[in-house]
Amino acid sequence: MAPTFQTALFFTIISLSFAAPNAKQVRWCAISDLEQKKCNDLVGSCNVPDITLVCVLRSSTEDCMTAIKDGQADAMFLDSGEVYEASKDPYNLKPIIAEPYSSNRDLQKCLKERQQALAKKMIGHYIPQCDEKGNYQPQQCHGSTGHCWCVNAMGEKISGTNTPPGQTRATCERHELPKCLKERQVALGGDEKVLGRFVPQCDEKGNYEPQQFHGSTGYSWCVNAIGEEIAGTKTPPGKIPATCQKHDLVTTCHYAVAMVKKSSAFQFNQLKGKRSCHSGVSKTDGWKALVTVLVEKKLLSWDGPAKESIQRAMSKFFSVSCIPGATQTNLCKQCKGEEGKNCKNSHDEPYYGNYGAFRCLKEDMGDVAFLRSTALSDEHSEVYELLCPDNTRKPLNKYKECNLGTVPAGTVVTRKISDKTEDINNFLMEAQKRQCKLFSSAHGKDLMFDDSTLQLALLSSEVDAFLYLGVKLFHAMKALTGDAHLPSKNKVRWCTINKLEKMKCDDWSAVSGGAIACTEASCPKGCVKQILKGEADAVKLEVQYMYEALMCGLLPAVEEYHNKDDFGPCKTPGSPYTDFGTLRAVALVKKSNKDINWNNIKGKKSCHTGVGDIAGWVIPVSLIRRQNDNSDIDSFFGESCAPGSDTKSNLCKLCIGDPKNSAANTKCSLSDKEAYYGNQGAFRCLVEKGDVAFVPHTVVFENTDGKNPAVWAKNLKSEDFELLCLDGSRAPVSNYKSCKLSGIPPPAIVTREESISDVVRIVANQQSLYGRKGFEKDMFQLFSSNKGNNLLFNDNTQCLITFDRQPKDIMEDYFGKPYYTTVYGASRSAMSSELISACTIKHC
């Protein structure tokens, strides 16, 4: 057994032997002996309660990805280019923690100054002390001199508080943060994290940036010195923002650059035939960004991966190279690793990584080095400079003006389906709080993480490689590897959300003449992600999923039309219509309960279809909060049944679980195991216990006048119920069009913007064949489901109508201003989700 593996095994056994019998473990995969040494240092020095770090050694990035896939390790850090490769078969890994960078500054000023001080490694140097949120500790002490003093929120020394060692220290008070930073911290954390909440942008002094941007809605606006919006500056997404002031925003991106010696004289368009040094073949900054620019500028002769691998093409472009991880002999000739380790995609190759690429250039093994801007140092500016794609050269500190593009920071990855994600997150967040040496090491540069890292940030659980990298970069990487396949303009790949839908879709595909193909996801969100990635083209979504889809950039192409009393729009496209025939959300009461109206429902007993449902929860809750200063719904009603709520809360008191199986403990379950769940359940709740039920208007007609034979419903009459109107009056249930809480927008077929015309054309053709009046409706029916209900389309759909896009904000255009104002006006975060958080990552 080799000594390095004996050492690795020893440390692994030691770390396991000291772990408690039931202690949780995070097995970190190290790609080299140097990374293993750093990992073992952390095992001994970074003690996180209840979670043990275990180091697993493999010989390369690819071997570590395999180990994680096979369950032999749990996590590793990858460059953004490697994240793409890891996301594919056979690895199927996903990013869970991001590594944000700061180009000039970071909002956590204390963390930045601390990192800079640690990087200098100067004996006797003052190192700021920061709290777990990245703020300055009120009292600062110099580790070498022993002097202590008080600071304000911005880290500035407070006059008269300096005390030498041995004397009683001044009492330091925690100073109030500037208003912007305080609001930012509340938005980002606090006791109650709300996804989609607006997070203010602050400058390094804690003042409001002149231009503010809402990460979820895409709106931007200008503010004054105290953060108040300046009238007339609000700009919707897709429009050019108002000019407030030039900014240098904090970014989670870095720059890919080309570094050369000043003594050389060639320009970017003269790279062919030169000797090259690269950080690695899987790296974005040292390889993929360069290839993309060379192809775009037509400097590289390459007919695509179908005819020739990109490595083969690049081996003919450069004379010789060192590209760790490459398979072409010519691309490894300049590497200097020992036998068996030469050109390895790990630190075992001395020229691996950003600092390795620089070393390759420095040792005159190459004419140009392709690496990341964070590896640049002012101390090299006398000898080196940047090679710019516009055929100029610039100083090293001008990397923002002279680069090959911006690319995302790397991430920590684990298995897509893993029970270790929470442990990994908890370990790294706690290690960060305890100021463990995650981001530096005496053993070398960029081990486990990049040395330029200031902090780690958890990603939304919905984030995958596509959502993290963004559309442009993801598809660029697919093109380089031959994974890209342009969708056909004559075929729609329809996404189905369950097995029954897939069966119906397959039947449709068989008679479509090749116009329809079928994909399958496990839920509507899965279909949204498939369409975003280009793996599917269309899906029909109910309104509760439309907000997420629109926030993620999809657009409605076609809408369902349900009004069977007016078939005109189906016969003649473009005919005017005012009623889609869709549902209305109503507040239903017993006619005998004369004293209740909309204005006095506080304290009453309420029945809801389920938490998150549009008619039974989102609309009534949004209205109540708007009209009652954001009242807490838990305490607004006397008692409720809102399936899906905390079982100990007031919102579950009226629920009864499963009357046929009281031992099942399903009270308040968001499923039919709660008798009061869903539309029928909420109506039953009203009949048996409640004062008001929030339901779609059709519920009363479907469960009265002999329509429902159940014991609790068989004798009910529709005339025994009334509607509560928002003006305080009441009305018969037949007046649902005028006495409602809100209309509900129709379901829509969504797709990518560039695919709208193709989807509309193909769907119109299929409807002419298999719609209600279709020529071939005896062969197949779009709006009928003999294997279930409402499959692919709602069964009461009369026809599909092209969405009439108006030149306004897409949210108001689809939802309609009344609905949009009702649901989102009071709190835009009301419908936020992990998917929206993932979709609204600011990409490079």
UniProtKB/Swiss-Prot annotation:
Any Pfam family: Transferrin
Q: Enumerate the spans annotated as Transferrin-like domain.
A: 26-106, 245-482, 492-828
Similarity remark? Belongs to the transferrin family.
* Tissue and organ expression note: Plasma. Highest levels of transcripts found in the liver, the lung, the pancreas and the brain.
S-S bridge residues: C29-C64, C39-C55, C110-C130, C141-C148, C150-C172, C180-C202, C222-C244, C277-C360, C322-C335, C332-C343, C388-C402, C495-C527, C505-C518, C552-C839, C570-C799, C607-C685, C641-C655, C652-C668, C725-C739
The name on file for this protein is: Saxiphilin
- Gene Ontology BP term (one): iron ion transport
Q: How does it assemble?
A: Monomer.
**UniProt-annotated location(s):** Secreted
Main role?
A: Binds specifically to the neurotoxin saxitoxin. Its physiological role may be to transport or sequester an endogenous organic molecule other than Fe(3+). It may participate in a detoxification mechanism for neutralizing a microbial toxin.
Q: Where is this region: Absent in transferrins?
A: 109-249
Major location, coarse class? secreted
Per UniProt, the keywords (alphabetical) are: Disulfide bond, Repeat, Secreted, Signal
Signal sequence extent: 1-19
One Gene Ontology term, aspect cellular component:
extracellular space
**What sequence ranges are listed for the domain Thyroglobulin type-1?**
107-172, 177-244
Matches recorded under PROSITE patterns: THYROGLOBULIN_1_1, THYROGLOBULIN_1_2, TRANSFERRIN_LIKE_4
